[in-house]
């Protein structure tokens, strides 16, 4: 069968997920492309992982094993507590236009601690929708999406 297809370029997992959620089975190819590309532009991506070596970046001294929070690939937060780094990263990402915070927690996270953390985030950002999913991703404690 002949089908019209178009590849939507994304660079992060949250961008890909946002593009998928914008897809309308009833819509035309052109309308879907526009909606997906618009959604991708509106999503901010963050991640929480650990440093694999000592370094200094943008005036931040980082030691191997430190917890780092990245926003759009740039190191924004450095600390030794996963949840505190994630909390600060979310604060860096949320602005007056934000409506939704989505977190995907990794295989090395404690589910009970994550649930408590999500309760705290929901309280802090009570005017936003907050979602959390078990991503089971290696290396990254959290992947964060703010739309």
List the model feature ranges, each with a label:
Residues 1-147:
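N-terminal loops that bind phosphate or other acidic moieties
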């Amino acid at each position: 069968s002949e089908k019209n297809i178009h590849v939507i370029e994304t660079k992060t997992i949250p961008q890909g997920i946002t593009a998928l959620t914008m897809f309308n089975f009833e819509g035309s190819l052109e309308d879907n492309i526009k909606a997906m590309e618009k959604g991708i532009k509106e999503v901010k991506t963050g991640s929480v992982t650990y440093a694999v070596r000592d370094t200094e970046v943008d005036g931040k001294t980082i030691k191997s094993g430190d917890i780092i929070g990245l926003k759009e690939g740039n190191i924004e937060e450095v600390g030794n507590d996963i949840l505190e780094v994630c909390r600060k990263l979310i604060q860096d990402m949320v602005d007056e236009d934000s409506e939704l915070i989505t977190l995907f927690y990794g295989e090395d996270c404690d589910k009970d601690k994550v649930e408590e953390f999500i309760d705290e985030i929901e309280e802090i950002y009570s005017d936003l929708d907050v979602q959390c999913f078990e991503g089971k991703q290696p290396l990254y404690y959290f992947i964060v999406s703010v739309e």
